[in-house]
UniProtKB/Swiss-Prot annotation:
The keyword RNA-binding does not apply. Its main location: cytoplasm. The gene is clpP1. PANTHER family: ATP-DEPENDENT CLP PROTEASE PROTEOLYTIC SUBUNIT. GO terms for cellular component: cytoplasm; endopeptidase Clp complex. One of its GO terms (molecular function) is ATP-dependent peptidase activity. Pfam families: CLP_protease. One of its GO terms (biological process) is protein quality control for misfolded or incompletely synthesized proteins. This is ATP-dependent Clp protease proteolytic subunit 1.
């Protein structure tokens, strides 16, 4: 169930779901696995907020175990495409594609709450069918692995070989370790946005 928020102004009352109310304050919340529905919603929100005010920053709070690489890359590309700076904030867990999107925020504006966890690893996948079909899928997963590792290398300042080694298996970090790694820029104790 999605909580509702009652807002009173000028003698009238309006009811919003909490996510719509947060969006009015330029806050996007990714609190689930990355799927095509999730990606379509977040891409639409990013484009809407850019159209509303291309000069005003956007805040994206992330609590996600990851999900679809293709859908996550759609969000990532849109984050790079829109004009506003994007603050990313890890709340709870940013794993796999969640961590990738956390690192995709504007440099200097990527953060985490202090008890969150961040995890990077290589893309997961599987294939069935004829040998030639399996080969096609394997080649695609290797391509995606290289693409994600290259982006992480650029965003963290780490050598590509270091990223490849670290993402070979699940690699968990505390927020402070993620700062040292270059995935984020600061650990938050205070709220980075105005009261809503």
């Amino acid at each position: 169930m999605i909580p509702l928020v009652l807002e009173e102004s000028g003698g009238s009352e309006r009811v919003f779901d909490i996510y719509s109310r947060l969006l009015r304050e330029r806050i996007i919340f990714l609190g689930e696995q990355v799927t095509s529905d999730t990606a379509n919603r977040i891409v639409a929100q990013l484009l809407f907020l850019e159209a509303e005010d291309p000069e005003k920053d956007i805040y994206m709070y992330i609590n996600s175990p990851g999900g679809s690489v293709y859908d996550g890359l759609g969000i990532f590309d849109t984050m790079q495409h829109v004009k506003p700076d994007i603050h990313t904030v890890c709340v709870g867990l940013a794993a796999s594609m969640g961590a990738f999107l956390l690192a995709a925020g504007t440099k200097g504006k990527r953060s985490s709450l202090r008890h969150s966890r961040i995890m990077i690893h290589q893309p997961l996948g599987g294939a069935r069918g004829q040998a030639s079909d399996i080969r096609i899928q394997a080649d695609e997963i290797l391509y995606l692995k290289e693409r994600l590792n290259t982006e992480l290398s650029e965003r963290t300042g780490k050598e590509l070989e270091t990223i490849k080694g670290d993402t070979d298996r699940d690699f968990y970090m505390s927020p402070q370790e993620a700062v040292e790694y270059g995935l984020i820029d600061l650990v938050l104790d205070k709220k980075p946005v105005k009261n809503i």
